[in-house]
Amino acid sequence: MKLYMVPLAPNPTKVMLYIAEREQLGVHMDIEQIVVNTVKGRHKEPEHLARNPFGTVPALELDDGTFLVESLAIVEYLEAKFPKATLYVGTPEKIGKAKDLERIIDLRLGGPMGTYGHATNSPLGRPPEPEKAAQCLAAMQAPLDYLEQLLSDGRPLLGGDQVNVADCTLQSSLQFMRFVEVDVFGDRPLLRAWDERYRARPAAQAVLKW
């Protein structure tokens, strides 16, 4: 299989962190990772559009030559294809809560973070949009408070003692925030401590560039 990605973008980074975490658990998927240079517009060229007609990354080329183009679908496909030492473990209730947490982070936090970054210091050269940035910053506060409260029980990772996809999703967006030089934590020491712990993990050390 081949993963077409770009190291900074949150959605590809989520998948890359997921793969690296599974590697740390002894699951070797043999997925080649290929950079698509989005700064040069390679994601909008015919070669990549043949993989993903929406012109986004990531795109996972399967062994049969077809593609998956949504990050969470890629993760769940790999969970099913390599069912040993997965990141979704435990009772149906525990798995449901882990998936719920990942969606909260991706939809309620990751989206505003990405828009905020591009509205303030876009790596793609987009013009600043102060009003949009202010709206996104306001939207981030409730989910950030939710995560701070979640960590108040002493858990080392977002889902408890074991890493899950929610950790990968949050860290992928935070890397983008670091790149655009934005500190989103504010007065949230537990989230800041989680960030330091997660970034010290071998998987994070192998994947994160910022």
What is each residue range found by the language model?
Residues 89-90, 159-160, 207:
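Short histidine-centered beta-strand/loop micro-motifs
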Residues 1-2, 155, 209-210:
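Generic structural signal for short, solvent-exposed loop/turn connectors between secondary structure elements
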Residues 28, 33, 186, 207-208:
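A generic structural-conservation signal
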Residues 1-134:
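GST-like domain detector, emphasizing the conserved glutathione-binding G-site
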Residues 105-200:
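GST-like fold's C-terminal all-alpha helical module
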Residues 79, 173-174, 208:
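Active-site-flanking alpha-helical
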